[in-house]
Curated annotation (Swiss-Prot):
It comes from Xenopus tropicalis (Western clawed frog). Its cofactor is Mg(2+); Mn(2+). Belongs to the Nudix hydrolase family. Keywords: Hydrolase, Magnesium, Manganese, Metal-binding. A motif (Nudix box) lies at residues 129-150. This is m7GpppN-mRNA hydrolase NUDT17. PROSITE patterns: NUDIX (PS51462). It comes from the Eukaryota. Acts as a decapping enzyme capable of hydrolyzing monomethylated capped RNAs (in vitro). Hydrolyzes monomethylated capped RNA after alpha and beta phosphates to form N(7)-methyl-GDP. Shows low activity towards unmethylated capped RNA. It is an enzyme of class 3 (hydrolase). Residues 90-236 form the Nudix hydrolase domain. The gene is nudt17. Mg(2+) binds at E144, E148. The lineage of its organism: Eukaryota, Metazoa, Chordata, Craniata, Vertebrata.
Length: 301
């Protein structure tokens, strides 16, 4: 059951009064030129509100906010907005937090959401969830990481990667939106290898059905398979045929190989959801890759 008290997104622009974001309001477009799909904003938690502003404010951080071109909220017509049930139209915009755990050998953890979940079932994402009242972003992210995977991380270096405007269903062709979030992607860096972290995994099968560690080369292939590109779902260069994942079967993790094509799949325009990496996760992976040292140039070798 949803908490009666939720941390909601509030907006201010050009020193206007702070107002709660409306469910049908395209937030990214509010801060970008010509209703575009990315914007540089300032954000932070303030008295159980997640504030987004075009200007710096105390304890805020500058960060990129982005949405997909096919964002349902962006493309919602006035008629469709009016057709939303009152409890949806008046629920505001929730705040989510997702944690990319980076091992010391430069791999990141993704989890596959359980098929039984109502939102984004069977989709690969970083561990995460809602921010509870009174929590800071990192505190919420580490709590969700612990609850979903069993990993307990404390005192780890971290940074905010970026914000993603998310809606579910992810495409208007799949139905009118019932959820609208601003997802905060955090990067936390462990001093352990992915093998050491893997041994500590104890996923909650109510939320997680599998785990995978991605290296930088696989992440690059996944990022290249954009969800709204004409050639999406096809490898953009050398890619392995399969990826080793850990599936949760009868309470225990079991190793198996999944086709690389699964991780390059995109959201179907109609019909049942398919196993895939979420569009927001691809965005987070692209931001993660940008944090890594660039390989030295070979031009003069």
């Amino acid at each position: 059951m949803e908490s009666a008290k939720r941390v909601l997104v509030c907006l201010t622009k050009e020193n206007s009064l702070l107002q709660c974001a409306k469910f049908v309001q395209g937030i990214t477009g509010q801060y970008s030129a010509n209703n575009g799909d990315k914007a540089l904003i300032h954000c932070g938690l303030d008295r159980n509100q997640f504030v987004i502003s075009d200007r710096q404010f105390p304890s805020s951080a500058p960060v990129q906010l982005q949405r997909p071109s096919f964002c349902p909220i962006k493309n919602l017509s006035p008629t469709q907005a009016a057709a939303l049930p009152g409890e949806i139209r008046n629920r505001g915009v929730d705040v989510g937090v997702a944690v990319l755990v980076q091992s010391v050998n430069k791999k990141v953890l993704l989890t596959r959401r359980s098929k039984s979940l109502n939102i984004f079932p069977n989709v690969w994402v970083p561990p995460g969830g809602h921010v509870e009242p009174g929590e800071q972003l990192l505190e919420a992210g580490l709590r969700e990481l612990r609850e979903e995977t069993g990993l307990r991380l404390q005192g780890v270096p971290w940074c905010m990667l970026g914000l993603w405007e998310s809606a579910f269903p992810p495409l208007l062709s799949q139905g009118l939106p019932s959820r609208h979030h601003i997802v905060t992607y955090l990067l936390v860096q462990s001093n352990q290898t992915h093998q050491q972290l893997q041994e500590r995994l104890c996923p909650d099968e109510r939320e997680v059905s599998a785990c995978v560690w991605l290296d930088t080369e696989i992440a690059k292939c996944i990022v290249a398979a954009e969800d709204d590109a004409k050639d999406s779902g096809k490898p953009q260069g050398p890619a392995p045929a399969t990826i080793r994942v850990s599936e949760l079967i009868n309470g225990s993790l079991s190793q198996s190989d999944r086709s690389m094509a699964t991780f390059l799949s995109t959201a179907p325009k109609e019909g049942e959801a398919v196993e895939r990496i979420s569009t927001g996760t691809k965005y987070a992976l692209s931001l993660w890759l940008e944090t890594l040292p660039k390989a030295p140039s070979r031009e003069h070798e």
